[in-house]
Every structure is written in structure tokens, then in C-alpha cells.
Amino acid sequence: AFLFISAQDIEKAVLVHEYGHLLGLVNMGYTSPHDHEDPDHPHHSNNEESVMYWAIESQDFYNQLDGEPPNNFDTYDLDDLNLMRQGKL
């Protein structure tokens, strides 16, 4: 079956992903209390459901997809951002 992914879906995922890096995700200048950094892809999530997953900015992105690309931060990403906002990271 052919899966159509719109340019807008891809653009949103990439923009949110890069914005996450600008905010410091994942483990850029801090150490997360959560073990969610991919050891093979530094500063990226090991959760395929997170917009911070490494394949979002990779050619492998298209090979990894079996649906719409993730465009939201996962629970650990959001918790890291909240802890940074509170000055706890």
C-alpha cells in the first residue's frame, strides 16, 4: 500500500525537531533524569514516537515511517523542558 505523507507533515516534524534542539533537547548542556537519549545518535530520543527521534532529520526517516511522522515531544522531553524552565536542570 502506498502511504502519502504531505510536505506539511514533514516540514512540521523537522521544524519542531530542530526547535527542540534549540531548546536543548536531548541532553544538550544538561543531563536528563530520564534515560531517553539514543546512545547511537547523541542528542536524540530513543523513542520512535518522539519528534526528537533521530530519524526525523535523516534519510532513514522515510524508511522508518509506517504512518504520519511524529510532531510532538514525548513525556520525557516535556519533563526535561519543564525542569529546565524551573531551573532544576
For the regions a language model picked out, list residue spans one by one.
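Pan-zinc metallopeptidase signature
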Residues: 78-89
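The catalytic-center signature of Zn2+-dependent metalloproteases
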Residues: 2-78
